[in-house]
Amino acid sequence: MAFLILLRHGKSVWNEKNLFTGWVDIPLSQKGIDEAMLAGEAIKDLPIDCIFTSSLVRSLMTALLAMTHHNSKKIPYIVHDDPEQKHMSKIYSDEVNHMIPLYRSSALNERMYGELQGKNKKKTAEQFGEEQVKLWRRSYKTAPPNGESLYDTGQRTIPYFQETIFPLLQNSKNVFVSAHGNSLRSLIMDIEKLSEEEVHSLELPTGKPIVYLWTGHTFERHPELFG
């Protein structure tokens, strides 16, 4: 058995400005920092053996801030996967016993919003119509201009999960994933076997952990950590 913790990053500066963010590398706002800390309080008693984040800073900030509350007191360290940099994260002392490896991958990035990135969501709805923007944001296979649909996002997130994260769970390793609304929606769609219609209405608030227990045969959703 193993725990899988999924956490959408805390609010970013652009979330608060109501702008499409996508792959633009925007940091957390003060509210987002507070949300990450509260999320850390919520999961502080759950065992964590390794951490995965996207390549975007708001995802990394959320994971690092949350882990400052963890009862293990272990320190996350970024593992460099590039062969030319791999030696940089090697630890040559027993300090390794007080660390938790953290892996970053663009496979977990938010969906790429293409030509909507940086645009105000309200003004975009006024320009293209609310139904068109809703279709871009919530439908399964319709992508914004030069961007990704949720289906496209799942084409990178799900293989990464199945090839890299799931084997760890099968080996009873507890995994914490800090990522984004749409990258996590695509993973939850796969984990819970949701239909296209069901994922259409799936909303993930910022800074609220979702916890699954891998039983060895299936994923079971953990009771809510927040009231």
Curated annotation (Swiss-Prot):
* Keywords recorded for this protein, A-Z: Gluconeogenesis, Glycolysis, Isomerase
Q: Which residues bind substrate?
A: 8-15, 21-22, 58, 110-113, 121, 137-138, 181-182
Q: Which reaction does it catalyse?
A: (2R)-2-phosphoglycerate = (2R)-3-phosphoglycerate
Which SUPFAM superfamilies does the annotation name?
Phosphoglycerate mutase-like
What top-tier enzyme class does this entry carry?
A: isomerase
According to UniProt, residues marked as the site described as Transition state stabilizer are: 180
Q: What is its EC number?
A: 5.4.2.11
- Positions of the catalytic residues: 9, 110
Q: Does the keyword Isomerase apply?
A: yes
Keyword Cell inner membrane present in the record's keywords: the answer is: no
A Gene Ontology annotation in the biological process aspect, one of them, is: glycolytic process
Citing just one GO molecular function, the answer is: phosphoglycerate mutase activity
Q: Where does this protein act, in terms of pathway?
A: Carbohydrate degradation; glycolysis; pyruvate from D-glyceraldehyde 3-phosphate: step 3/5
Family assignment from sequence similarity = Belongs to the phosphoglycerate mutase family. BPG-dependent PGAM subfamily.
The protein's job, in short, is: Catalyzes the interconversion of 2-phosphoglycerate and 3-phosphoglycerate.
Protein name listed in UniProt: 2,3-bisphosphoglycerate-dependent phosphoglycerate mutase
Protein's organism: Chlamydia abortus (strain DSM 27085 / S26/3)
